């Protein structure tokens, strides 16, 4: 069902000395109806206005896009377990799923190809947000003749209900690993990533062997629906956060009503490399009080020292707010290339020292309180 929202309304209301409003005397004007997808919430402000024969108060009603329709999901039985599913399918006995779709996520100027891959598991490999699937590419392991390839882990980029909201699919965010010879500069297909190329080259209907799900470090804590979650990613490390944010802002789950703050920092090379940017930008518009989104574009932006803008530079820029939020119990997550962590740790240590704090002690406390979540590869 669509909703009509009043974007602006002004009504002239006669009032007595005790400000009681006579219902029969309302006169409306300046009605504008826009965007069908929002349900209106009115805020009232009263100010005196001389209308000639009698003093009136003008009640100005401003409308916020505060009730955004969400998607109905099923089966809600996926909310019942108190513990996350773990290793339901072992690498030696993987589940055979089916490729639903493969979509290129990045633009032509991105350095490399990243794909969004939807897999149909028919409800047989359930998972929670923040977990990973193991993928076993077809073929033989060249280092172990007669044996299958090793398992490659990929963070799941959807909620437990999947992109179709029916609990039967899971999505992966995969960057194609291509090797270029450092001397000739030419691609050497024999050294390309086996699993990432298999996934990005897959077609709808192709079969895929998956193991898992695995992982508990990046699970989204849901004991406090008003908690703050600071999410830091480079590249495909944004995958689990897409799942978090869809659960927070897109899906209608009766037992989970998010009212806290989600703050995403995403570092990529350039605008063409941004992943799921349209989704995140929409959340920013729809939920300005509950979502913040900062991007670091290393090949297009400069930091305060004139160097490349990395995600740690954005962290330093907002460090006062971040540290205050951490002091108040915020969770902070890091996901992406392993090489991102040294620069981030150095930045956090430098900021802590400027604040007269010991970063080692603070980090120890964050880990003790289970506020610190890291998954790098």
UniProtKB/Swiss-Prot annotation:
Involved pathway(s): Energy metabolism; photosynthesis
The keyword Oxidoreductase is assigned to this record: yes
One GO cellular component term: chloroplast
Binding residues for FAD: 152-155, 173-175, 179, 194-196, 236
Feature: transit peptide: 1-61
EC category: oxidoreductase
Pfam name, any one: NAD_binding_1
Annotated localization: Plastid, Chloroplast
Keywords from the UniProt entry: Chloroplast, Electron transport, FAD, Flavoprotein, NADP, Oxidoreductase, Photosynthesis, Plastid, Transit peptide, Transport
GO biological-process terms attached to the record: photosynthesis
EC identifiers of the protein: 1.18.1.2
Cofactor(s) for this UniProt protein: FAD
Signal peptide: none
Amino-acid positions noted as binding NADP(+) in the UniProt annotation, renumbered to this chain: 155, 175, 236, 268-269, 298-299, 308, 336-337, 375
Domain named FAD-binding FR-type: residues: 92-220
Catalysed conversion reaction: 2 reduced [2Fe-2S]-[ferredoxin] + NADP(+) + H(+) = 2 oxidized [2Fe-2S]-[ferredoxin] + NADPH
InterPro entries in alphabetical order: FAD-bd_FR_type (IPR017927), Flavoprot_Pyr_Nucl_cyt_Rdtase (IPR001709), FNR (IPR015701), FNR_nucleotide-bd (IPR039261), FNR_plant_Cyanobacteria (IPR035442), OxRdtase_FAD/NAD-bd (IPR001433), Riboflavin_synthase-like_b-brl (IPR017938)
A Gene Ontology molecular function term of the record: ferredoxin-NADP+ reductase activity
Chief location category: plastid
Similarity comment: Belongs to the ferredoxin--NADP reductase type 1 family.
Known function: May play a key role in regulating the relative amounts of cyclic and non-cyclic electron flow to meet the demands of the plant for ATP and reducing power. Is involved in nitrate assimilation.
Stated name of the protein: Ferredoxin--NADP reductase, root isozyme, chloroplastic
Organism, scientific name: Pisum sativum
């Amino acid at each position: 069902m669509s909703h009509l929202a009043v974007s602006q309304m002004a009504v002239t209301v006669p009032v007595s000395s005790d400000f009681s409003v006579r219902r029969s005397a309302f006169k409306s004007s300046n009605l504008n109806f826009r965007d069908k997808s929002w349900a209106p919430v009115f805020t009232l402000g009263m100010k005196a206005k001389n209308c000639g024969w009698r003093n009136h108060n003008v009640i100005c009603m401003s409308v916020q896009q505060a009730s955004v329709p969400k998607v109905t999901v099923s089966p809600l039985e996926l909310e019942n377990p108190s513990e996350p599913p773990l290793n339901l399918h072992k690498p030696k006995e993987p589940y055979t799923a089916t490729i639903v779709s493969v979509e290129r996520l990045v633009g032509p100027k991105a350095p490399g190809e990243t794909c969004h891959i939807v897999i149909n598991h028919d409800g047989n490999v359930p998972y929670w947000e923040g977990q990973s699937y193991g993928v076993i590419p077809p073929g033989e392991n060249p280092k172990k003749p007669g044996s299958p390839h090793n398992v490659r882990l990929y963070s799941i980029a959807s909620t437990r209900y999947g992109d179709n909201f029916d609990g039967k699919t899971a999505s992966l965010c995969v960057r194609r690993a291509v090797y270029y010879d450092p001397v000739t500069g030419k691609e050497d297909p024999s050294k390309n990533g086996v699993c990432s190329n298999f996934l990005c080259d897959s077609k709808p209907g192709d079969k895929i062997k998956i193991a898992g799900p695995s992982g508990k470090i990046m699970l989204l804590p849901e004991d406090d629906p008003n908690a703050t979650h600071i999410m830091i990613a480079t590249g495909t490390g944004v995958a689990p956060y897409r799942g978090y944010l869809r659960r927070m802002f897109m899906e209608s789950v009766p037992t989970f009503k998010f009212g806290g703050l989600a703050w995403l920092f995403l570092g990529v090379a350039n605008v063409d490399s941004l992943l799921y940017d349209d989704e995140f930008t929409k959340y920013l518009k729809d939920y300005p009080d509950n979502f913040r989104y900062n991007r670091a574009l290393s090949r297009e932006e400069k930091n305060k020292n004139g160097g490349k803008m990395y995600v740690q530079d954005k962290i330093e820029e907002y460090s006062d707010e971040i540290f205050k939020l951490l002091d108040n119990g915020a969770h902070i997550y890091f996901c992406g290339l392993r090489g991102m962590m040294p620069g981030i740790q150095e930045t956090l240590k430098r900021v802590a020292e400027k604040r007269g704090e010991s970063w080692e002690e603070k980090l120890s406390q964050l880990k003790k309180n289970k506020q610190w979540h890291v998954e790098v590869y």
